[in-house]
């Protein structure tokens, strides 16, 4: 297992380099430069000399492969550079301020999705074509078809504007500093409720469908029929024998879902004005802040590769056949 994990880590290094290289080229080939953005986007009032100085300052006059090599040598030393924005703050500092919020949103979202999708999928599979199964099927189609931004706007209008129950932007109220400790926590949770609800809606629809399909495949297996023929209670058959095997594909899906969750957080954070990685990424793209964009991509790509590795390792732990196959392969 250790050698397998080490091999996967070594294979992830060239993959990460390839991701960053392609992203670096695409970003720099996009129209507009940081100098043009900061001086007015080539308007009549723009100072050409200032743009030239900014290009030289940022080494943007060098060939792309030279720029990428210089950036890569800094990344190896964990030096993400400084932002091109007027504050010129270190990229790691800006990311460090935003990353915890994005991780909190995604972790809570994933926990809610798993906690709800597993029982929904199991109940739908064990009662196939029942009214509950039909209702959840409609919910799945609605969840897949509903854009996050459209759902976010509807919930903001309903709960924030018309009913006034929940805040619709930011993480804290204006009077947050004057609230008691527990009121501050309640205020913070209230600001996160709508974003988490929006982010969870589509994922819950997909995961419940995956769980249902996986459970249907398992309950049709011979060993499940044998367990029922032995007179075991249905609760034991489903909970002890079927559920564990039905969860195996879900482990892989969870690892592969991380990029989509982070990508979805870009939309949610932008709409709800949440100061997370997604909002930072959008601002950096509009400002052509190359160091911040690449820093975000490195962090997100690394998290994705690590999540996929953890999913594979977890899969081997819950499925003994993987470990046996790996031992036979070494022989």
Task: Explain the meaning of each model-derived region.
Residues 6-15:
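N-terminal signal-anchor/signal peptide hydrophobic helix marking the start
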Residues 2-3, 95, 99-132, 161, ...:
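Alpha-helical transmembrane segments of integral membrane proteins
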Residues 60-118:
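An internal, D/E-rich "acidic patch" concept
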Residues 22-29, 58, 73, 139-169, ...:
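Membrane-water interface segments at the C-terminal ends of transmembrane alpha-helices
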Residues 12, 98, 102, 138-145, ...:
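Residue-level signal for discrete positions within transmembrane alpha-helices
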Residues 9, 50, 54, 64-80, ...:
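Hydrophobic alpha-helical segments of integral membrane proteins
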Residues 44-61, 137-146, 194-199, 236-253:
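Hydrophobic alpha-helical transmembrane segments
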């Amino acid at each position: 297992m250790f050698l397998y994990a080490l091999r996967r880590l070594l294979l992830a290094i060239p993959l990460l380099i390839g991701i960053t290289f392609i992203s670096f080229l695409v970003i720099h080939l996009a129209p507009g430069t940081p100098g043009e953005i900061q001086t007015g986007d080539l308007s009549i009032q723009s100072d050409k000399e200032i743009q030239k100085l900014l290009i030289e300052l940022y080494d943007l006059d060098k060939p792309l492969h030279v720029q990428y090599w210089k950036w890569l040598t800094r990344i190896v030393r964990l030096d993400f550079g400084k932002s091109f924005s007027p504050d010129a703050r270190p990229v790691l500092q800006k990311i460090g301020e935003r990353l915890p919020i994005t991780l909190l949103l995604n972790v809570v979202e994933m926990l809610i999705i798993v906690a709800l999708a597993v029982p929904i999928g199991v109940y739908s599979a064990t009662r196939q074509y029942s009214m509950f199964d039909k209702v959840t099927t409609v919910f799945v189609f609605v969840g897949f078809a509903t854009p996050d931004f459209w759902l976010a706007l509807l919930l903001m209008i309903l709960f924030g504007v018309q009913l006034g129950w929940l805040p619709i932007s930011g993480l804290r109220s204006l009077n947050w500093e004057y609230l008691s400790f527990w009121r501050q926590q309640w205020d913070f949770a209230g600001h996160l409720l709508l974003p988490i609800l929006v982010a969870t809606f589509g994922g819950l629809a997909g995961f419940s469908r995956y769980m249902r399909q996986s459970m249907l495949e398992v309950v049709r297996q011979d060993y499940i029929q044998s367990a029922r023929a032995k007179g075991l209670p249905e609760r034991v058959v489903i909970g002890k024998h079927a559920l564990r095997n039905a969860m195996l594909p879900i482990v892989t899906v969870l690892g592969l879902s991380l990029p989509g969750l982070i990508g979805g957080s870009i939309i949610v954070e932008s709409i709800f004005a949440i100061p997370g990685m997604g909002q930072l990424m959008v601002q950096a793209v509009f400002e052509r802040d190359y160091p911040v964009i690449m820093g975000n991509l490195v962090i997100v790509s690394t998290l994705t590769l690590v999540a996929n590795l953890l999913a594979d390792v977890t899969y081997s732990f819950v499925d003994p056949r993987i470990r046996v196959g790996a031992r036979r392969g070494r022989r």
